[in-house]
């Protein structure tokens, strides 16, 4: 029994060391899995307590303070290591989560949104919108070129992809983690966001033909970008009648 718990303690210490190393090397991925990591951490406590209780059933009543000490130790490690908490008031032992990093990330996101919005406004005022009409393919070509022009200025990649046949659907989703799930969402006309925030797929229909607007980025693509680029398609429609009247 003693040997078992000694091995378990050293495994936990090794696991904590691995966690610290992973945080240095793969900080973003570790943050994504933080909820699962913390659940695993407390599961280890429960398993250890159950093993000890199995061999010493009366210990829960005669040595309950041992359970309490270990539980507090797990909670403190969770607070200081996993939640990056620090002591705010030494006398009151008050703990709070360090939110500085979160605020910095939010500030960066805000600046990114503002820069993209400014670029969007500048392009609308200074870049001509060339309209293609006469057929569905011509209209789609015009939309595709418009999206690519704006995306290039915003450090994004945009394309209008065919999505009518099963071959089109398979081609679009072949590199996705779960192609069937992505296709199901797009068939329901739901916007798809990948779990890493790098890809957004937006269902788009031109008369009887189905398309998907694909937005990708090396940094992040959000609902904000989805709204900007879908508004471009509406602007394109507003310009189209003017061009047609001019031809008449």
UniProtKB/Swiss-Prot annotation:
Pfam families: SpoIISA_toxin
Keyword rRNA processing included in the entry's annotation: no
Extracellular side: 1-3, 65-67
Membrane-spanning residues: 4-21, 42-64, 68-87
Induction, as annotated: Expressed at low levels during exponential growth, it increases dramatically at the onset of sporulation (at protein level). A member of the spoIISA-spoIISB operon.
Location in or out of the cell: Cell membrane
Keyword Transcription regulation among UniProt keywords: no
GO CC term (a single one): plasma membrane
Topology within the bilayer: Multi-pass membrane protein
GO biological process, one term: sporulation resulting in formation of a cellular spore
InterPro entries attached to this UniProt entry: SpoIISA_toxin
Assigned keywords, A-Z: Cell membrane, Membrane, Sporulation, Toxin-antitoxin system, Transmembrane, Transmembrane helix
Gene ablation phenotype (knockout): No change in sporulation efficiency.
Residue intervals annotated with topology Cytoplasmic: 22-41, 88-248
Primary localization: membrane
Subunit annotation: Probably forms an oligomer; X-ray data suggests the inactive complex forms a heterotetramer of SpoIISA(2)-SpoIISB(2), which inactivates the toxic activity of SpoIISA.
Family: Belongs to the SpoIISA toxin family.
Role description: Toxic component of a type II toxin-antitoxin (TA) system. Its toxic activity is neutralized by cognate antitoxin SpoIISB. Expression in the absence of SpoIISB permits sporulation to stage II, when plasmolysis zones and holes in the peptidoglycan layer are observed, resulting in cell death. Lethal when synthesized during vegetative growth in the absence of SpoIISB. In E.coli both the membrane bound and soluble domain are required in cis for toxin activity.
Protein name: Stage II sporulation protein SA
Species per Swiss-Prot/TrEMBL record: Bacillus subtilis (strain 168)
């Amino acid at each position: 029994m003693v040997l078992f718990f000694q091995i378990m303690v050293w495994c936990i210490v090794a696991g904590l060391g691995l966690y610290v190393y992973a945080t240095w090397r793969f900080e973003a991925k570790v943050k994504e899995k933080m909820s699962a990591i913390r659940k695993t951490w407390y599961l280890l406590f429960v398993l250890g307590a159950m093993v000890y209780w199995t061999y010493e059933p009366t210990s829960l009543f005669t040595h309950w303070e041992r359970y309490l000490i270990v539980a507090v130790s797990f909670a403190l490690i969770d607070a200081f290591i996993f939640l990056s908490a620090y002591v705010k008031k030494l006398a009151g032992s008050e703990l709070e989560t360090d939110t500085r990093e979160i605020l910095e990330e939010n500030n960066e996101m805000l600046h990114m949104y503002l820069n993209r919005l400014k670029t969007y406004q500048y392009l609308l005022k200074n870049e001509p919108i060339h309209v293609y009409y006469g057929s569905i393919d011509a209209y789609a070509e015009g939309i595709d070129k418009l999206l690519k022009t704006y995306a290039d200025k915003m450090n994004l990649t945009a394309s209008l992809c065919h999505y009518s046949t099963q071959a089109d659907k398979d081609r679009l989703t072949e590199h996705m983690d779960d192609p069937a799930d992505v296709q199901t969402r797009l068939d329901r006309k739901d916007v798809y966001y990948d779990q890493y925030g790098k890809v957004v797929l937006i269902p788009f229909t031109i008369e009887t033909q189905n398309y998907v607007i694909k937005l990708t980025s090396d940094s992040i693509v959000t609902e904000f970008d989805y709204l900007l680029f879908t508004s471009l398609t509406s602007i394109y429609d507003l310009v189209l009648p003017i061009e047609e009247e001019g031809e008449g």
